[in-house]
Amino acid sequence: AVNVIKKNQTIRSYTVELTTRQPFHIGAFQDPMSDVHNPFTTLGGVPVVQGSSLKGALRAQLEEYLILNYADDNPAMRPCIPAPWNNLSPDERSLVPYQDRPGKYRGSSCGERGGRGKSLCPTCYLLGAMGLVGFVQMPYLYLDSEDDIEEVYQNRRDRASDTVARGANRTMQAIPKGAVFRGEMEVLLRDEIRDWTLGQPRRMLRSFRDEWLQGGQRWGQEEFIREFILDRLQAIPRLGGMISKGFGGVEITVTPA
């Protein structure tokens, strides 16, 4: 892999390739002038997977991995739930520590709980929190194959007549199985001005600290990138909407750009 220095930052780029293994849908707002009820997201007329969708899927994979492999032995490695406490559902609140209940998540958003000496969770360290950037910049993935958006029709069955309900025909857009999306992800390895190095505690944080990196557990930078970024991104099994209807299966590969 080739590292590039940009404005006192050492950055490594990776090509992210997503291949659809099932019909695939990333939703956009409905155009009031169109008959399509659930359009596919496009940018400049090209179907895309937004960076926010990919980042959310990576975060979910990281959370699951941390909970299954580290959280019980090292509470500092428990992920947060990335939302303010007031926005958490009762079920989500049951996942955080309370009195004698340990919880699998450490609490609500790290950014919301900011303050001098507050510990930042691994997912926010990598992907950012409110008021603090992370080390990974997720790309938009653009359709890079000959496939095109196709229209899919859906309906609802009338339980009384056992026929299609009147007015229930709906049109959505999807990409077929086998389509390929590509984009370029950037990983910050070193920031000379801030004195940040990926995989090490950051030194300038008055409002946060990287407690999970200050204990006995240590990773080399290449091992850190592989375990917490590349392997987790390639472990994403599904993405997008309509998953319960057979959509969203994907295969992601990441290679040095």
Label each residue range with its predicted role.
Residues 1-157, 162-257:
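RNA-binding basic/glycine-rich loop and surface signature characteristic of RAMP-family CRISPR effectors
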